[in-house]
UniProtKB/Swiss-Prot annotation:
GO process terms (BP): DNA recombination; DNA repair; SOS response
A Gene Ontology molecular function term of the record: ATP hydrolysis activity
Main location: cytoplasm
GO cellular component, as recorded: cytosol
Keywords tagged on the record: ATP-binding, Cytoplasm, DNA damage, DNA recombination, DNA repair, DNA-binding, Nucleotide-binding, SOS response
Coiled-coil regions listed: none
Family that this chain belongs to: Belongs to the RecA family.
Protein residues bound to ATP: G67, P68, E69, S70, S71, G72, K73, T74
One Pfam family this sequence matches: RecA
SUPFAM superfamilies in UniProt: P-loop containing nucleoside triphosphate hydrolases, RecA protein, C-terminal domain
Name this polypeptide is given: Protein RecA
Function per UniProt: Can catalyze the hydrolysis of ATP in the presence of single-stranded DNA, the ATP-dependent uptake of single-stranded DNA by duplex DNA, and the ATP-dependent hybridization of homologous single-stranded DNAs. It interacts with LexA causing its activation and leading to its autocatalytic cleavage.
Gene: recA
Stored PROSITE patterns: RECA_1 (PS00321), RECA_2 (PS50162), RECA_3 (PS50163)
């Protein structure tokens, strides 16, 4: 539909004035601006990358990863840091919980020598550091662990029995208002790790669970990932890891509510090889005959753990099967459901 010529002139004049005051590009016609593809940082999990729809977590956005204790929240975040560093990214870890295991991070592939780490005393200090490094323009990814540990200064300075209603929620709301635009401008990804709490006096319908830090983060986050431990992995009666399910409960860059399941092995993190086998079997790329798993004419091993061990050693073969899986799923990146039952017994 054609726009009136007088209106066009008025709009053009207004755009010029806005450009003078706020800088070029402050207001643009969408048709004049090329729509850029959303860049992403891999999560280190094939299934979760597919579930997110763009191959990982989006750059320049706020991400929330939440779930119960020992569900894999920090492990997933450390994998994202490792993937970002592999592509030359600079990463920071704001350890508000003062609980970062450097040796574990290194085993997950994190370049700990070049990882920026802060262990702030208060929530205000943590968020000031976050804002400063983001505004520098030199950082690609920041992880805050965790929202629950961002304790307001007034609460730290007060007595144990003092009531500080809504202080943390106001702190988060204020910080997110300030930093959202900066993150987009600097193309910096911000990941908040969060814990869950039970709603007091919850009656009737709805989930009794909620996340800490108020409602602001729920609104500002472009992606929210709920991660849960769903089973224990055992080998010869020995507990060797956990099976985790990650659900994308909010996604502003692709369809939400997709899920992914993966193994988190103790001391190793997310098992990429396990996902390759799961998706390979589901898509008939990997053959399963009894307990034996094979790819084309090559035997991968008897049992899932043996096949995983072979793929861990043969990176070229693992990459080849991964490529076949991605091609099979297709360019629309529709997530394929995982097997209804694990390939080996779990508890």
């Amino acid at each position: 539909m054609a726009i009136d010529e007088d209106k066009q002139k008025a709009i053009s004049l207004a755009i010029k004035q806005i450009d003078k005051v706020f800088g070029k590009g402050a207001l643009v016609r969408l048709g004049d601006k090329q729509v850029e593809k959303i860049d992403a940082i891999s999560t280190g999990s094939l299934g979760l990358d597919l579930a997110l729809g763009i191959g990982g977590v989006p750059k320049g956005r706020i991400i929330e990863i939440y779930g119960p204790e020992s569900s894999g929240k920090t492990t997933l975040s450390l994998h994202i840091i490792a993937e970002c560093q592999k592509n030359g990214g600079v990463c920071a870890f704001i350890d508000a919980e003062h609980a970062l295991d450097v040796h574990y991070a290194k085993r997950l592939g994190v370049d700990t020598e070049n990882l920026l780490v802060s262990q702030p005393d208060t929530g205000e200090q943590a968020l000031e550091i976050l804002e400063t490094i983001t505004r520098s323009g030199g950082i690609d990814l920041v992880v805050v662990d965790s929202v629950a540990a961002l304790t307001p200064k007034a609460e730290i300075d007060g007595d144990m029995g003092d009531q500080h209603v809504g202080l943390q929620a106001r702190l988060m709301s204020h910080a997110l208002r300030k930093i959202t635009g900066v993150l987009h401008k600097m193309n910096t990804t911000l990941i908040f790790i969060n814990q869950i709490r039970m709603k007091i006096g919850m009656m009737g319908y709805g989930s009794p669970e909620t996340t800490t830090g108020g409602n602001a983060l729920k609104f500002y986050a472009s992606v929210r990932i709920d991660i849960r431990r769903i089973a224990a992995l055992k080998q010869n009666e020995q507990h060797i890891g956990n099976r985790a399910k990650a659900k994308v409960v909010k996604n502003k860059v692709a369809p939400p509510f997709r899920e992914a399941e993966f193994d988190i092995m103790f001391g190793e993190g997310i098992s990429k090889e396990g996902e390759i086998i799961d998706y390979g079997v589901k898509l008939d790329i990997v053959d399963k005959s009894g307990a034996w798993l094979s790819y084309q004419d090559k035997k991968l091993g008897q049992g899932r753990e043996n096949a995983k061990a072979l793929l861990k050693e043969d990176k070229a073969l693992a990459d080849e099967i991964t490529l076949k899986i991605k091609e099979s799923i297709g360019s629309n990146e529709e997530i394929m459901p995982l097997p209804d039952e694990p390939l080996e017994e779990m508890e």
